[in-house]
Design a protein with these regions (language model features):
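Active-site neighborhoods of metal-dependent hydrolases
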Residues: 1-50, 196-203, 207-222, 244-248, ...
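Flexible inter-domain linker/hinge segments
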Residues: 1-62, 466, 474-512
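Histidine-rich, glycine-flanked metal-binding segment
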Residues: 35-65, 72-125, 453
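Acidic, glycine-enriched loop/beta-strand segments at the rims
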Residues: 73-83, 397, 405-439
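Hydrophobic, small-residue-rich alpha-helical packing segments that form membrane-like cores
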Residues: 113-122, 140-278
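Metallo-beta-lactamase
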Residues: 129-133
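C-terminal, active-site-flanking charged/polar segments
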Residues: 425-465
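Short, surface-exposed, low-complexity cationic segments
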Residues: 461, 540-558
Length: 558
């Protein structure tokens, strides 16, 4: 069997290279858990049969579900072809699939009662974690799931001015509403308060999992310090949208207020909000975890023009007021937008997110992240001594998965494909990688993916569309998803949250920084020239030209 026929049947072998959509990125498979000539394969006349590669045993002794022979791209696993065993919603084993009674070296025991997801020729990633979502519409869930996002840290509960939710009454209804979608959910409480009472109330009584300090509601010294003090006491994260007008604090002042305490700096480039013109200075600071939102990724020719209208709309500005118009324009800087891409490529910004409906697009974070990776490869080049982009691909994958999970205390449950974690796994056809997933498994159960004509003879008959699977119907979404809350909510003991989801306490959010992120731990001195807009890192200038076009875009979407 020649290599192309083998790959078409069993998936690529170790050493084979795979193109990722039209991104310009290529991965090389580092290892293959299969053994040549004795492969596990389901189908008519294949080896996944009783007495061959299926063990005759109770399901509890094997797996509920197995994903066979899939290429994993994961910051923890690397890029490997393996099978993934799932039991009771969690990853229970990774490696070679089969029957240990007939095969040697079996890691994933597949039984006669195991359901099989054929992963040959597909790519598996951990479900993306979006930590910056303004939940102004319930339809955001559809866009997120259809892009491979399985965990959301949100603010608001509809078209209300919130920037964080503190009311236990509102959080109770919000958690209840989310039981309709197969997505893990956590809420940020509003941290812009000089008094700690509403913050503690949000955590202990409402079930919030962190705070959002936002300039529109107050990002001054007292509010920021109060949020950080409560966060330190309760082990939750503080997300910061800093003082763009520099009314109370400059970027240097904000860093002093932190006093070395951990913070997650949202849209650290600044167009989405933050100290004008040099909030990007916070990137590379050891206690600041920086993230980007997707409208500026990758930096393109229309980015400057596009953002004026978005800023005006989201922040309720009046364009006929000269002061409002000037405030909007001051936030838009081509120099920092271009430098943002380079800082990502260097690993100095470790997270990407959407800022959905708060100047971002819920369904575009994954594809814009890899479009940025492709742009950086084209602009900055690939390593001369290798014929693949594994290092770059894994760095950008970490920005979507494990790093946001680490920042918000979720990494013990989600963010990577590791034994013991929830089986939130996204399967992609290589030609659609980053743009449109083939299947989204939530706790190992089909939740969203490609569906065909329901009246057709087979499930692959056109038209093929992305839509809900059985995991998105009935009571199942709540059963296969979790609610991330503060430990204080679990300790409270009084059940004010009607959600049917399992509640999981966030942890490990304090005393961390870029050094704790995967593959994105670069620190250094970032400066922005206030006259020219030139950005430097440790004195070296950072420039990136606006792209005329972006990958993973028009080829896949009308």
């Amino acid at each position: 069997m020649n290599p192309y026929e083998y790959a078409a049947t069993h998936g690529p072998r170790a050493g084979d290279r795979v193109r990722l959509g039209d991104s310009g990125l290529t991965i090389r498979v580092e290892s293959d858990a299969q053994r040549y000539g004795d492969e596990f394969l389901a189908g008519f006349g294949k080896t996944a049969r009783d007495g061959l590669h299926l063990k005759a045993a109770a399901v509890r002794e094997t797996c509920d579900v197995v994903i066979s022979n899939v290429v994993v791209i994961d910051a923890a696993q690397g890029i490997r072809k393996v099978s993934i065993g799932i039991r009771e919603g969690r990853i229970c084993s990774i490696g070679r699939a089969g029957n240990p009674d007939t095969l040697d070296g079996v890691d994933v025991v597949v039984g006669t009662g195991t359901s099989i997801v054929s992963g040959e020729g597909l790519i598996a990633t951990a479900g993306a974690v979006d930590t910056h979502v303004h939940l102004l519409s319930p339809r955001i869930m559809e866009a997120s799931l259809a892009s491979g996002v399985t965990t959301i840290i949100g603010q608001e509960f509809g078209p209300v001015w919130g920037v964080g939710v503190n009311s236990p009454w509102a959080l109770r209804h919000a958690f209840n509403a989310f039981d309709a979608w197969p997505v893990n959910i956590g809420f940020l409480g509003r941290g812009s308060s000089s008094d700690a009472a509403p913050l503690v109330e949000a955590l202990a009584e409402g079930g919030a999992s962190g705070f959002k300090v936002h300039e529109d509601m107050g990002a001054h010294t007292r509010a920021l310090d109060t949020a950080l003090r409560v966060a330190e006491e309760h082990d939750v994260q503080v997300a910061l949208h800093s003082d763009g007008l520099n009314e109370c604090l400059s970027v240097e002042d904000t860093l002093r207020v932190l006093e070395g305490r951990t913070i997650h700096a949202f849209h650290i480039e600044g167009c989405g909000g933050g100290h004008v013109p040099n909030v990007l200075k916070m990137a590379g600071v050891p206690n600041v975890i920086g993230s980007s939102t997707n409208p500026t990724l990758p930096f393109g020719r229309d980015a400057v023009a596009e953002h004026y209208g978005m800023i005006v709309s989201v922040h309720d500005l009046k364009t006929d007021l000269p002061g409002d118009a000037a405030m909007a324009r001051d936030r838009i800087r081509a120099g920092t937008m271009g430098a943002e891409d380079v800082l990502h490529d260097l690993g100095a910004i470790g997270i990407t997110s959407s800022d959905a409906q708060g100047m971002g697009r819920a369904g575009e974070t994954v594809r814009r992240t890899f479009a940025m990776a492709g742009k950086m490869k084209a602009e900055r080049g690939a390593p001369a001594d290798v014929d693949h982009d594994n290092e770059r691909v894994l760095r950008y994958m970490a920005k979507l998965t494990i790093n946001p999970a680490i920042a918000h205390g979720l990494a013990h449950e989600v963010g990577s494909i590791e034994v013991g974690k929830l089986a939130d796994i996204v399967l992609w056809r290589p030609e659609f990688f980053g743009a449109k997933p083939q299947l989204v498994l939530k706790s190992g159960f089909p939740a969203y993916g490609v569906v065909g004509d329901p009246n057709a003879a087979t499930d692959t008959c056109e038209p093929l569309v992305l839509g809900p699977q059985f995991g998105a119907h009935g009571a199942t979404p709540a059963e296969i998803s979790v609610a991330f809350v503060a430990q204080a909510a679990l300790d409270q003991g009084n059940d004010l949250m009607p959600t049917r989801r399992r509640r999981v306490a966030v942890r490990g959010t304090r005393g961390i920084g870029p050094a704790d992120l995967r593959l994105n731990s670069r620190t250094g001195s970032v400066d922005v020239d206030q006259r020219t807009g030139l950005v430097t890192l440790d004195g070296d200038p950072l420039r990136s030209e606006p792209a005329d076009s972006a990958s993973l875009n028009r080829l896949y979407f009308l």
